[in-house]
Amino acid sequence: MSTIRCDIVSAEQEIFRGEATLVVATGELGELGIAPKHAPLITRLKPGKVVVTTPNGEQLDFAISGGILEVQPQVVTVLADTAIRAQDIDEASVRKAKEEAERILANRGEAMEVAEAQQKLAEAVVQLQALERLRKTLKH
């Protein structure tokens, strides 16, 4: 079985480095599936999840707040603004951040404050979705 090296990095740290048989992420135009020997490409990533399928069939879920995906024939790199492994998500903190962002949006503060709240809300939703998917996987 052929593999492709996958690197997922954020501004703070390297989140994942390893071999994969498939990497799935959400680009600006929709969902992308990157397999070994994929044609080179660069695209923006929307906030969402990145799913890495390892050679043993395990699926690893990551939540990202957006970024860039670079694909070369032997390596796929996710350069995320922020990224976190699904199992590392602190649900209570994420829910609190989501509620705070919703409060700011409801009060319609300054334009910059609203833009930041929208970004934080998008990140919180993505993290909660990744956490829910992880829980469903663990139940099976």
UniProtKB/Swiss-Prot annotation:
**Which domain of life does the UniProt lineage start with?**
Bacteria
Q: Where in the cell is it found?
A: Cell membrane
**Function of the protein:** Produces ATP from ADP in the presence of a proton gradient across the membrane.
What does the sequence similarity comment in the record state about its family?
Belongs to the ATPase epsilon chain family.
Q: Which Pfam families match?
A: ATP-synt_DE, ATP-synt_DE_N
Q: Which cysteines are joined by disulfide bonds?
A: none
Q: How does it sit in the membrane?
A: Peripheral membrane protein
MF annotations from Gene Ontology: ATP binding; proton-transporting ATP synthase activity, rotational mechanism
Write down the InterPro entries for this protein, in alphabetical order.
ATP_F1_dsu/esu_C_sf, ATP_synth_F1_dsu/esu, ATP_synth_F1_dsu/esu_N, ATP_synth_F1_esu_C, ATPsynth_dsu/esu_N
Going by the UniProt record, its keywords in alphabetical order are: ATP synthesis, Cell membrane, CF(1), Hydrogen ion transport, Ion transport, Membrane, Transport
Subunit structure as annotated in this protein's UniProt entry: F-type ATPases have 2 components, CF(1) - the catalytic core - and CF(0) - the membrane proton channel. CF(1) has five subunits: alpha(3), beta(3), gamma(1), delta(1), epsilon(1). CF(0) has three main subunits: a, b and c.
Query: Origin organism of this chain?
Result: Stenotrophomonas maltophilia (strain K279a)
Q: What is this protein called?
A: ATP synthase epsilon chain
Q: Which NCBIfam families has this protein been placed in?
A: ATP_synt_epsi (TIGR01216), PRK00571.1-4 (NF001847)
Gene Ontology cellular component terms for the protein in this record: plasma membrane; proton-transporting ATP synthase complex
